[in-house]
Amino acid sequence: MNKDRVKLAIAPIGWTNDDMPDLGKENTFQQCISEMALAGFIGSEVGSKYPRDPNVLKPMLELRGMQICNAWFSTFFADGQRARTIDEFTNHMNFLHAMGAKVIGCSEQSKSIQGTTKAIFEEKPYFTDTEWQRVAEGYNELAKIAATKGMQVCLHHHMGTGIQTTEEIDRYMSMVNDDVYLLFDTGHAYYSEGSQEAMLAILEKYLPRINHVHLKDVRDEVVAEVKAKKLSFLDGVKKGTFTVPGDGVIDFRPVFKLLDEKGYQGWMVVEAEQDPAIANPFEYAVKARRYIKETAGI
């Protein structure tokens, strides 16, 4: 891959899990970003322990040669919370803009079960036609707002949400304007669709409109247990559904090849939520960085 076009970041969720704060509560913010830099990454997404004042956060990152590339934002358009979502989005956007980020990764969280005890496959939510329309109109509006700051909005397809499957991604992308992008997540695509081929098909279909990439690997044996026992998303995370690239079932070489051939320009972010007491985050960050260097050449 071309290192002039693609930058490597890592998400703090491997150190401290915002959905389950007890996982990694002992890991400090400064330890987290220091280990990211030491592992060879130059970018990070934003976790709950990160200072939200750019005047505080930016110098701490710059000291380590790091920068912010994105931060999760939850939208609630399907639920009819348009005004609240847009108001909170504007504040979030201004923070990211001050940090120098160019993309805003969003997830439509109306009806989401990802943070609940519900079975991740059997109790997945679905949107009505009216809710789909609200989501599309809402994201089109967010894209216009982001453009005023020279930024772009992308939708993070995610397990346990109304935009998870290939069909749902297709419907979403067909309804929004061309200035609304997709955040492609290898792990969530594989987890949802169950195969390397289906995961790659999403990537290939939408590459011109993918502006942010999450690199997440999957352990097939844990997914099988999640299905057999009808476990929740968070139960799966604690058991090790996800891991870093090179440690699970996904072959990332075709992913990197597609991104390179299509001229992808932006960040690739290692995002692998595990229990840090079991999977040492620094050790796994080093493992991920080594694998990417070996397979992507950057």
UniProtKB/Swiss-Prot annotation:
EC number: 4.2.1.44
Keywords from the named record: Cobalt, Lyase, Manganese
Cofactors demanded by this protein: glutathione; Co(2+); Mn(2+)
Database matches in Pfam families: AP_endonuc_2
Gene3D superfamilies hit by this protein: Divalent-metal-dependent TIM barrel enzymes (3.20.20.150)
Family: Belongs to the IolE/MocC family.
Transmembrane feature ranges: none
Name this protein carries in UniProt: Inosose dehydratase
InterPro entries given in the database record: IolE, IolE/MocC, IolE/XylAMocC-like, Xyl_isomerase-like_sf, Xyl_isomerase-like_TIM-brl
Record field: catalytic activity: scyllo-inosose = 3D-3,5/4-trihydroxycyclohexane-1,2-dione + H2O
Gene transcribed to yield this protein: iolE
UniProt xrefs under SUPFAM superfamilies: Xylose isomerase-like
A GO MF term: manganese ion binding
